[in-house]
């Protein structure tokens, strides 16, 4: 898949959440979500902040590095200090103000993404990323934080085949999830077989692998983004 296709799917996923937010009330924006201390407005503010830094990572790496240094500088103060930096400006805005800020930063990111080639690399928090993986990570973010919002408000968001991006990211970052938790990475291969929302089948890993995960793509994506426990899904 070309970077332009990933960018188009990202824009579509953002618009799906935009359409849901268009119909909610000011009280809904203040509703707590599953993320500690975060309201619906904070979820959107998080996307707003990091869509902007993502755009700068593409168009102005030096400016991005300054913002990265700022974030590293407050990280020792805990989650509250990070929230103050990344959400503080938005928390002073009205719900319509937060909504419009997100839309504006989405446009910045879309314009920046349009300059990327398939072989481009983008500076980011941690190692640099290939352009397609970089935009896939942004799609995963809007889908996952969108899930927090639809869960909090009881909204309906039908699954789509754009989940393939999220599932792909979940598969390829398996080893990193162990490393990040200071755990030994298992040597055994894993086969992942998922039923797509469209009815197609998606698969990763060798057939006959000693371990396998099977189920719906939506359940798999909910688990790899830590929005559901495996016991609360139909994954095998």
Kindly label every feature range from the protein language model:
Residues 1-45, 54:
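An N-terminal domain-cap segment
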Residues 1-5, 52-110, 114:
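Short, helix-capping/interhelical loops that line the mouth of catalytic, cofactor-
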Residues 1-6, 23-24, 30-31, 59-71, ...:
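Structured surface interface patches that mediate subunit assembly and partner/cofactor docking
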Residues 6-13, 43, 98-101, 105, ...:
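Amphipathic alpha-helix face/heptad-repeat signature
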Residues 14, 18, 22, 51-55, ...:
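Structural signal for well-ordered, non-membrane alpha-helices
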């Amino acid at each position: 898949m070309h970077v332009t296709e990933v960018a188009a799917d990202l824009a579509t996923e953002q618009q799906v959440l935009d359409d849901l937010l268009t119909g909610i009330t000011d009280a809904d924006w203040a509703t707590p979500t599953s993320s500690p201390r975060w309201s619906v407005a904070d979820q959107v503010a998080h996307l707003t902040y990091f869509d902007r830094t993502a755009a700068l990572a593409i168009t102005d790496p030096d400016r991005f590095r300054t913002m990265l240094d700022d974030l590293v500088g407050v990280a020792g103060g805990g989650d509250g200090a990070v929230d103050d930096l990344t959400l503080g400006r938005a928390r002073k805005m009205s719900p319509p103000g937060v909504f419009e800020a997100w839309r504006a930063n989405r446009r910045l990111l879309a314009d920046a993404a349009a300059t990327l080639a398939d072989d481009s690399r983008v500076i980011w928090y941690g190692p640099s990323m290939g352009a397609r993986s970089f935009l896939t990570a942004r799609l995963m973010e809007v889908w996952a934080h969108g899930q927090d919002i639809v869960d909090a408000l009881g909204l309906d968001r039908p699954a789509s085949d754009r989940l393939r991006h999220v599932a792909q990211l979940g598969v390829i970052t398996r080893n990193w999830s162990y490393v990040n938790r200071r755990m030994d990475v298992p040597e055994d291969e894993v086969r992942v077989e998922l039923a797509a929302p469209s009815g197609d089948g998606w698969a990763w890993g060798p057939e006959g692998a000693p371990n396998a995960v099977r189920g719906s793509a939506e359940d798999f994506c909910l688990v790899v983004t830590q929005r559901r426990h495996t016991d609360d899904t139909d994954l095998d």
